[in-house]
Amino acid sequence: MRLNIGHIKGQELERPMPSAIVRNLERRAAQEAVDAAVAVLDLNFEQLADTLQVDRRTVYRYRKRQTVPTPEVRRRFDMLREIIQLLEEIFAKPEDRHEWMYRSVPLLRGRRPIDLMLKAELEPIVEILAGYQAGAHI
């Protein structure tokens, strides 16, 4: 991440953002993603740990902003945030989002999205939701 420090003769000057600031931003992003997963997807910490492929205690530390996610976990958080955003855009009611997550979906060969999520298989869920958002039949 880079920090814009001004302009000289139309050129933007940048310097690397201090690592402490980056770590704080990453901790906050992880905490917000945990909160969103609990609120929107109704996941508990154990389910979220399975989704992120981390220990349940690590999820607790993310929630308390005590640790920075690894690059791989950040990637999973990114996909999880995308799933949450797409679900909120596609399904207006929380109960409709919940029903979709827990029912068999033909495009997932009859599997339930929650089952894929708990195995950290997030890409197919993102792809299907993005297709729905683009106008594919639900």
Model-derived features with residue positions:
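Non-transmembrane "mature" sequence context
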Residues: M1-I138
